[in-house]
């Protein structure tokens, strides 16, 4: 005979495991998207400027070209120099 309490617990644990697996998969997918869109060191530290039609800013002529995020670039550069100084004093 099947115990209803035991069945409910097993079903609850199964649902919890599925939710955790789904969350892990979603987190990994977001992490991969973040890595691809904000790569470091290979010329991909740029941000897309919104187009003029969408009400975005009117910086550098908005022809779809990528524009460097200078603050982020300076941060990466400073971190790199600091890391090199620590590795090779």
Swiss-Prot record:
Its main location: secreted. GO terms for biological process: cell differentiation. This is Phytosulfokines 1. One of its GO terms (molecular function) is growth factor activity. The keyword Transit peptide does not apply. Belongs to the phytosulfokine family. The N-terminal tripeptide (YIY) is the active core. Expressed throughout the seedling. More abundant in fragments containing shoot or root apexes where cells proliferate vigorously. Keywords: Developmental protein, Differentiation, Glycoprotein, Growth factor, Secreted, Signal, Sulfation. Sulfation is important for activity and for the binding to a putative membrane receptor. Residues 23-79, 85-89 form a propeptide. One of its GO terms (cellular component) is extracellular region. Residues 33-68 are annotated as: Disordered. It is found in: Secreted. Glycans are attached at residue 42. It comes from the Eukaryota. It comes from Oryza sativa subsp. indica (Rice). Residues 1-22 form the signal peptide. The modification Sulfotyrosine is found at residues 80, 82. Promotes plant cell differentiation, organogenesis and somatic embryogenesis as well as cell proliferation.
């Amino acid at each position: 005979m099947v115990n209803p309490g035991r069945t409910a617990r097993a079903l609850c644990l199964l649902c919890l495991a599925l939710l955790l697996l789904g969350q892990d998969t979603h987190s990994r997918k977001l992490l991969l998207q973040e890595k691809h869109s904000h790569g470091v060191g290979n010329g991909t530290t740029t941000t897309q400027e919104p187009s003029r039609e969408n009400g975005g800013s009117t910086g550098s002529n908005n022809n779809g070209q990528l524009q460097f995020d200078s603050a982020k670039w300076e941060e990466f550069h400073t971190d790199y120099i600091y890391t090199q100084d620590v590795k090779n004093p």
